[in-house]
């Protein structure tokens, strides 16, 4: 679900544990056409609160990855995976025939890599996945904060 939060675009994913994509920013705002985008991903529920800063090159194609999953609504064999530039956010997708299961991984940055957190969200193939891809695309294309 796409919304506004503190004057910035927010994408919320999930049910029991909510994933929030927010606070999009350019890593080097003084560089013209800087491709490095940073944003926060927060996983939150009554029992957990985890936040990671994600570094990408113009989103690393996360929206394209999700759009391809939506286009393959009839299903695929095995696991499809995506990772951000520095591996702080990972995503794996499995199609069960009735649902697409997305496992979102939030990771501590190297070299420490002391922790990692994963949560799986279920989505209907096709339109539900297309909406998620569109929301992530709008988020990544929104005006980064200074």
Predicted regions and their residues:
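Charged, alpha-helix-forming regions
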Residues: 1-48, 54-55, 139-146
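A structural detector for beta-sheet-dominated domains
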Residues: 13-14, 20-24, 42-44, 53-57, ...
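Short acidic/polar mixed-charge low-complexity motifs
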Residues: 15-17, 46-50, 87, 98, ...
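Short, low-complexity cationic-aromatic patches
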Residues: 32-34, 48-62, 119-130
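Intrinsic, low-complexity N-terminal interaction/targeting segments
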Residues: 33-38, 81, 89-113
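Short, structured motif recognition centered on aromatic/hydrophobic residues
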Residues: 62-69, 132, 136
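Short glycine-rich, low-complexity/disordered patches
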Residues: 74-89, 142-146
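Mixed-charge, glycine-accented linear interaction segment located at domain edges/termini
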Residues: 109-146
């Amino acid at each position: 679900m796409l919304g506004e939060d503190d004057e910035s675009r927010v994408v919320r994913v999930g049910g029991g544990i909510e994933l929030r994509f927010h606070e999009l920013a350019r890593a080097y705002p003084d560089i013209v056409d800087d491709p490095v985008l940073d944003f926060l991903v927060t996983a939150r529920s009554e029992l957990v609160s985890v936040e990671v800063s994600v570094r990408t090159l113009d989103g690393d194609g996360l929206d394209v990855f999700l759009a391809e999953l939506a286009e393959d609504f009839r299903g695929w064999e095995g696991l499809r995976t995506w990772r951000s530039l520095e591996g702080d956010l990972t995503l794996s997708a499995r199609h069960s025939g009735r649902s697409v299961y997305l496992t979102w991984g939030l990771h501590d940055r190297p070299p420490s890599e002391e922790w990692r957190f994963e949560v799986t969200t279920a989505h209907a193939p096709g339109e539900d996945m297309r909406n998620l891809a569109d929301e992530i695309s709008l988020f990544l294309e929104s005006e980064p904060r200074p």
